[in-house]
């Protein structure tokens, strides 16, 4: 039982220490990926050439035209 708990603790520690799946972008609200998910859209491109996938609620709203 102790070996099982030690193994689980080690796996939890390793999973917290390894970096995430994607680089952060757009003020930490987006992720740099090759493809965006359905709920995300591309607003800018990352420095590594990938797309910065951002959820629409974090993208700036377009301002109306002033005449």
Curated annotation (Swiss-Prot):
One of its GO terms (cellular component) is extracellular region. The keyword ATP-binding does not apply. GO terms for biological process: defense response to bacterium; innate immune response. Keywords: Antibiotic, Antimicrobial, Defensin, Disulfide bond, Secreted, Signal. Gene3D superfamilies: Antimicrobial Peptide, Beta-defensin 2, Chain A (3.10.360.10). Has antibacterial activity. It is found in: Secreted. Disulfide bonds join 25-52, 32-46, 36-53. It holds the Pfam family Defensin_beta_2. It comes from Mus musculus. This is Beta-defensin 36. Belongs to the beta-defensin family. InterPro entries: Beta-defensin, Beta_defensin_dom. The keyword Signal applies. Residues 1-22 form the signal peptide.
